[in-house]
């Protein structure tokens, strides 16, 4: 745990590594490895049945965020809105988390054509042609909404820059390679965030993650 905080007259900022960041780190890394197996045709990456892997790992990544959204909705409902997450951040949960979680589930069912995944001629990319610009835009909007609601301390990094990087690459010079670029940038960010956690709360685009309220002592009340 890394903490700087507001207790009494002192400012308190807490940043903890909760379940979400670890789940995303391992899921994104698994995706990168699986995509390389398909791209370079390593071992089972040569087989036809392994083409279902990108769909499964992307679905798992989406479900991780969906579970986090539902967690915020439930705990926000129980606590009257505000609740203190295991990331050390005050979040405001409500019906919007339910809606965004459902949108994530719809995203999963909108992924098609995974049997058409193939490696480029020079094996530079794993290409998924059915990942159209419309799906990518819908995914980006859903994912940004998730980060805005649940990762407020670093939404600029993981919710804007991290989403736009593979989207621009797909639109301008790397058509069909969006999902592999998304996995690579996400895994790199997750590793960086774990090694340098204070960057998320002390960077130029960071926001104040928490203000802890402590009730006054009997001496103060007297």
Predicted regions and their residues:
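Non-cytosolic membrane-interface motifs at loop->transmembrane helix junctions
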Residues: 20, 93, 209-212
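An N-terminal, globular interaction/scaffold subdomain
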Residues: 9-10, 14-47
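Hydrophobic cores of alpha-helical transmembrane segments in multi-pass inner/ER membrane proteins
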Residues: 25-37, 100-113, 162-165, 215, ...
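Short, aromatic-rich membrane-interface segments at the entry and exit
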Residues: 20-23, 154-157, 180-181
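Generic multipass alpha-helical transmembrane bundles of integral membrane proteins
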Residues: 51-176
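C-terminal transmembrane-bundle signature of multipass membrane proteins
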Residues: 159-221
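Helix-loop junctions on the outward
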Residues: 14-20, 73-75, 202
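Single conserved hydrophobic/aromatic residue that forms the stacking wall/gate
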Residues: 1-8, 13, 213-222
């Amino acid at each position: 745990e890394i903490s700087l905080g507001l207790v009494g007259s002192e400012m308190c900022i807490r940043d903890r590594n909760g379940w979400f960041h670890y789940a995303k780190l391992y899921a994104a890394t698994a995706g990168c490895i699986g995509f390389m197996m398909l791209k370079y045709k390593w071992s089972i990456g040569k087989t036809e049945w392994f083409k279902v892997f990108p769909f499964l790992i992307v679905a798992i990544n989406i479900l991780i965020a969906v579970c986090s959204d539902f967690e915020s909705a439930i705990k926000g409902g129980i606590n009257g809105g505000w609740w203190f997450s295991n990331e050390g951040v005050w979040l405001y949960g409500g019906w919007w988390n339910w809606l965004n979680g459902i949108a994530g589930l719809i995203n999963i069912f909108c992924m098609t054509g995974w049997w058409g995944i193939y490696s480029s001629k020079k094996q530079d990319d794993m290409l998924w042609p059915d990942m159209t610009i419309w799906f990518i835009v819908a995914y980006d909007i859903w994912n940004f909404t998730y980060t805005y609601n649940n990762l407020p301390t670093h939404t600029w990094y993981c919710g804007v820059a991290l989403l736009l990087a593979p989207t621009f690459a797909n639109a301008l010079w790397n058509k069909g390679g969006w999902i592999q670029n998304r996995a690579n940038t996400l895994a790199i960010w997750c590793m960086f965030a774990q090694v340098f956690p204070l960057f998320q709360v002390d960077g130029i685009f960071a926001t104040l993650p928490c203000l802890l309220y402590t009730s006054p002592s009997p001496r103060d009340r007297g």
